[in-house]
Amino acid sequence: MITNTPLQFSVLWASILSWINISSPLILFGLYYGFLTTLPIGPSQILSIRAFLLEGNLSGTVAVSGLILGQLIIFLSIYYSPLYTLLLKPHTVTLLVLPYLLFYWYRIKDLLDYQSLRPINSIKDSRIYKIFFDSFIFQLLNPVLLPSPILVRLINLFFFRYSNNFLFVLSCFFGWLSGHLFFFNCIKFLLIRIEKDSPILYLLVKRIIYRTFSIFVLACILLYLGRAPVPFFTKKLNDELQFNKSGFLWLNKPWPTFFFDYYRWNRPFRYIENNRFTNKSPVKKSVSQYFFNISLSDGKQKISFTALPSLSIFEKDLKTYLNISTNNNNLYKNWLDTKNERKDNLLYELENRIQALDNGLVIKEVIEKKTSLSNNEGINLTKINDPFLNGSFRGKAIITKSPWLLKENSYKLKKNRKIVYLKENKLKIWISNRWRELRRKNLPLPWEPLNKNARRSLVLLIQGSKNKKLKRKLQQIHFSEEQALINLTKQTNISDLTEKLENKHLLNKKFTKISHFNWELVLNLSPRQRAVYFKELEYEKWQILVRSWKNLLSVNSINSTQLNKFILLLKKLFTFHKKFALQEISKELPRWTSKLRNDKFDVIAIGITDIRQRKVKNLGYLIKGKEKRRKIVRRFSQQSDFRRRLVKGSMRSRRRKTLIWKILQLKTHSPFFLRINEKHIPFQISLNKLNLIDVKHIFKNPVEKQKKIALFPTKNNVTLKKKTKADRLAIANRWDFPLAQWGRSWLLLIQSYFRKYLILPILIISKNIIRLLLFQTPEWSEDWNDWNKEMYIKCTYDGIEVSEKALPEQWLRDGLQIKIIYPFILKPWHNLQLETNIKKNLNDLMNTNDNFSTNIKKKKIKYSYLTAWGFETNAPFGDIKKKPSFWKPIRKELKKKWKKNILLNFNKIYSKFSLVKKKITNNSNNSINNESKDLVKENIKINNNLKFNLTNKNYNKKLPEQISSKFSQTILSENQIKNKYKISTNIQKLENLKFLKKSKIEKITKKINFDKIEFFNKLNNDNKVYFTNKQKKIENKQKLIKYYKKNISLVNKWSYFFKLNFNKINKNFFQFSINIIRFNINLISKIQQNLILIKNRKIWNPLKVSQINQKKDKINYKYSNDFGEKIQSLKINVNQENILLMSQAYLFHKIWQIEKTNNKCDFKYLLKNWTSNSVIKKKINRNLKKMDLKFLKEQNWKNWLQNFNKYNLSSQVWYKLAPQKWRNQINYQWKGKEQNNLKFSEKQIKALTLSKEKTFFYKLFIDSLLEQNRKISKRYKYNYLCYSYLDFKKQPNFLESTKNKKESLFNNEILQISKNQVNNNYKQDISLKSNLILWLIPTLTEKKYINKIETINRNNISLLKEKNKKNSRNKKTLRERERHETIRQWKWKSKNIEKRFKELGDMASLMTFMQDQENSVSLSAKMRENLDLFRLLFCRDVGVNKLTINSEHRLPRVLDDQILMYKVISLFLKSKNRFKKNVNITNFNLSTSRIEFFQNNNQNNNFNLINLEDIMLLKHRKELKVLNLLNLKQNTNQILNFNKVILKENKRKRIELNKIQNKNQNLTIKHFLWPTFRLEDLACVNRFWFNTSNGSRFTMLRIRMYT
């Protein structure tokens, strides 16, 4: 027993690791992803939590069981696709989940009874079924609360990938189940904690939980409504398709699509433009998604520019999380190890197959089989349709049963083509037919005749009309028709009545054809008459229908013909309107075009643009300037732009910078500033109140005026601040939302009508009635005139005038302003305006500007803006305008009158009491005198004060106050004075002084105003001069700065220019050095070629060399005058062109090529000087058989590849390289020389041929033909690469495109010569080559003899041995081929019987050819032992069926392979002589019998090396070839040493190997090259990697083709 906990954990961990190793990784993946699906919570989980908290454990477990059952059905729905599409489509969320959620919320919204809060204790309770059903349905519908349900859909992806593995599905389910069980255990723990910790009764807590869950369900419903689009109402674009309204097309669509707008854009959020400055540029249809990342290729890290962004980011995060560090060396080593391992496996497999062949197995069993595609029923697909079939024939060529039977199937082909043509051109034919109908029926031509009924109605119409021209035409038509009838009746002499009737019918037909009543007359009618005419035609059709209907009803027995006529009439009636209407051809176009309308702004409720721009509330025009240009004034909506630059109709994107977290949120807010909005602003004194404190004035006298500071001033100190423009805009923006605009605009209209027609008339009427009551004259006319002047102009929300009567567009939504022109002001009277006019003049003088003129002032139009509460403002949302008070002038007048009346009454009373006061004694006189003196002094003070106050600004106010105060003092003093006379005199003096001072004050004010004006004018002039001087200085400085900038830019440009020139000089110098290198390289290469030629010459004997030189000198001397100049010119031109057109890549390639050629043997010279020597061939054949094939092993294939040339030119090309004249002159020379020459020996003939070959070789190849040869060989390599990669058996005929106009000295290979010819007693056997066989070794032919042009390819060993002596054996007909033995289609049940039967067959065939009796006796004795086998074949009990198995289903029949047939027959079709029956078979591998081995034991002439690559599949062959060619070893020293050894041995034996001419050279060389026989595969693969379509980038790969 383990008591230590760490040991327990270690044991548990070890058991887990062992389980992981044993179990498959899919189980772990399933558990992991199943557990991940528990993270997104849906309504089913919420419902189960609610059941646990409110109704106890039993209800919770029931809810969990329903949830598990629903999830299990979802997992299993993957195996049934209709159920999967039903459950997991997004349409189900909107169509099923939302209504069910609403129904569930309505059910749990209110707590109707406390019984629902009691826990469930028994299964019989009805609530259990509801809980189970709800949880099951919610889990089945699978809605998720998260905005992106990736975790839920992630597991679906793995389900589709591993749905065939049921363990993965089970592990996912158990992972999901374990996660949910853990989740619900946590909920139970939460339930226990709530019950224990709740301070109140748990029933009351349940009420709160009940209410919270109902709110939470409602929040879920709102979330789903926000995520899912409304299915029925979506905004469409302007280019939307117009569907046919008559047909209910949407009913024919499948069930989810007719609920949703499937034409809407899902995720094109933005409209991308090519040009950022213009809006007319086309849209980028496809945006490239280049994402750079490191990728592995050939074991090395390289940059890939088309990586998946999500995958690369995930890989990067995973590496950082797991601390994985990748090393380049380790990666390369791992790659090498894997490749080496794969190579070893393939080689081991090949070795095993070869060993099986050695053990005696049949090739059929050893060859690697290829799997073919088949159905569940076991039926294999045909080879053409098989996707596993490789080659160019898959799905490209239609292969018939036999290409000779094409004429027999021509009729069927034509029929099928017609059917296909009709199907493809269905729309085209329909359009043409419709157009014919329109052209002939629906749109009648003017010269076409009218029907009989149409003619009759037209005649009646013309007769009733007043048109004289038409009546004349009618008379002419009638006259011509009568004459035509008379002529026709004269010609006919008919006796019978039937014949007369028939003749009348014919006459009517002819008459309609020749009738002059055509549609031209209808066109000449007036439009009104034409309309009447067409109506009459319709009416006539109805009449015909009514007549036929009456006839049907009147007749008792209704005939079928009458019914048919009636149906035809109905059809004509209903198709009458359609005939004259053009039938539109409708085609469903792609809805979302790339050209969308993208304006700068979008007017609300118009929807002109296709992309949502900033909303414009309204547009207006302003005319400004002397030119009176119109300016567009637009007001943008101040609402938040939640849909900025989105395509209309597209799905809304999830935006990360603009959140919506409130129930009603008018504006967008960034989450970055949320915390700032939450902070509370501390108490601060408003700036408006601080502005009231005169800070400057306080700081002047701080000690004295501290007491006067008031933070909260009184009413007298407050000065109201006017609203600025910003304040008005803020108020306007505050009111700028639809509901407020709607209420405000209606209030404004009501206020305007209420003011104009209710308030103002009531005021006018009441004022004039009161005037009548006060016995004053009423002012009806003046008031009503002012009332009529007042106008109400409707304006936009910005204040742009629209009109007096009409309202602006969208005024309820955009808003409204009402402008009052000449607003009405109620005045108490209209005559007393003296004081007001004086005040206005004074104010005008004070507020004058520079453009002031003393006598002229323009009158401004008085206006104001009406508010929603009936007030007036100077501007929209401005300050309330103060109206002149109605009672103020009345108060003033009353005060004046009251003062005057009191003074007069006081004087009267005072005069009455004056008589009583006469008794006053003389004592009072002194006091009166003193007081009079005081009065005089006071008068003087008044004068001084007046003079002082003239300079003060407030002289208009202070002066009357001082006068009134002094006047009141005098009155008080006069009351004490008893002398009446003196008081009256003083009063008169004071009044006179007052009037004088007033007149002086007016004069002084005028002077002061004029002085001010002059002072302002002087100041403005001085300022203008000062500012003009400043502007000039600034302009001069700006010019200097521009000049400095230009100089700096010029300096920069010159420096850049010098750099460019310097770079060009460097480039030219570098090119010059490269040219020098090129020249040296050419020299070295030519010297090397000459040296090699000199070395090779040493092989020959000195006698032969001397003879060759003599012949060469003779030929050169003879033809140097004729052709020397031409050859030199050719040399110069070729060299110059090659030097000039050499590229840098080509130069480096040549250098690399020269370096490589130094370390390898070159067989070109021997190939060029090829001669057939029978003696050498025999020796080489013998040596090859005895020699060990150590140099032909698998390890040395690369070196053999470099030493064999894959290329040979055809004779057609050589034939046309040289001109024809040169060939004729040489033939002529050879004829003359051959007549004089004696008979030479065989050695001398050989020497002569060698010398001739060399001379022509020098003449042609060294100069121009060598370059042509290189170019053609290069083209061959690139073209052969393409053709051989697709089909290596196919021989491409691409050299026909490179034909020159020149002629050559070389013969054509396709010359068919049937006889052996002997010239100069020299006998030779001629063997021909065909173009159909792959040519490998180049052979040059020459003009050896004078009389005839022949091919020289001498073979002393004949391919067909003794049979070649007969001409009949060189040819074979097609009929003879059919007599060959067919492939056996029966398989022996036992291998022993099969071997014994083979031996019997071979012995029987040998007996026919054996001549020696001894051998035949021994063979017959052996045959007797096995003769009992033949009896088994003829026994009834045994027979053939019991000894053999029918293997037709495995082995194909003779020529049943269609692709093989096509390849074989296509060769005959391509050849010129494909219709000939005779076929030359000397160059083909014939099926020889086993008897030849026994016949020719001494002569081993059929020695062919075996090709091993056919054992393996082509795919594995290619893989093994590539792996063998790649240098997978890091130490290259061993390889270099091995190469040197091979090169030495090859140099020693190269002459012997090159002179081999076996029966079939293709097989030997193919054996040497079989691993690299298709090296082009590598090039094609690399071509795909580098994304090139030609061979221009092969130099970078450094893949050298075998030369």
UniProtKB/Swiss-Prot annotation:
Intrachain disulfide bonds: none
Coarse class of the protein's main subcellular location: plastid
Pfam families in UniProt: Ycf1
Membrane spanning stretches: 11-31, 58-78, 86-106, 131-151, 167-187, 213-233
Topological type in the membrane: Multi-pass membrane protein
Gene Ontology process terms (BP): protein transport
A GO-annotated cellular component: chloroplast inner membrane
Transmembrane helix found in the keyword field: yes
Compartment(s) of residence: Plastid, Chloroplast inner membrane
Keywords from the UniProt entry: Chloroplast, Membrane, Plastid, Plastid inner membrane, Protein transport, Transmembrane, Transmembrane helix, Transport
Superkingdom: Eukaryota
Protein family membership: Belongs to the TIC214 family.
PANTHER family to which the protein is assigned, alphabetical: PROTEIN TIC 214, PROTEIN TIC 214-RELATED
Summary of subunit composition and partner proteins: Part of the Tic complex.
Function of the molecule: Involved in protein precursor import into chloroplasts. May be part of an intermediate translocation complex acting as a protein-conducting channel at the inner envelope.
Protein name, per record: Protein TIC 214
Organism, as annotated: Physcomitrium patens
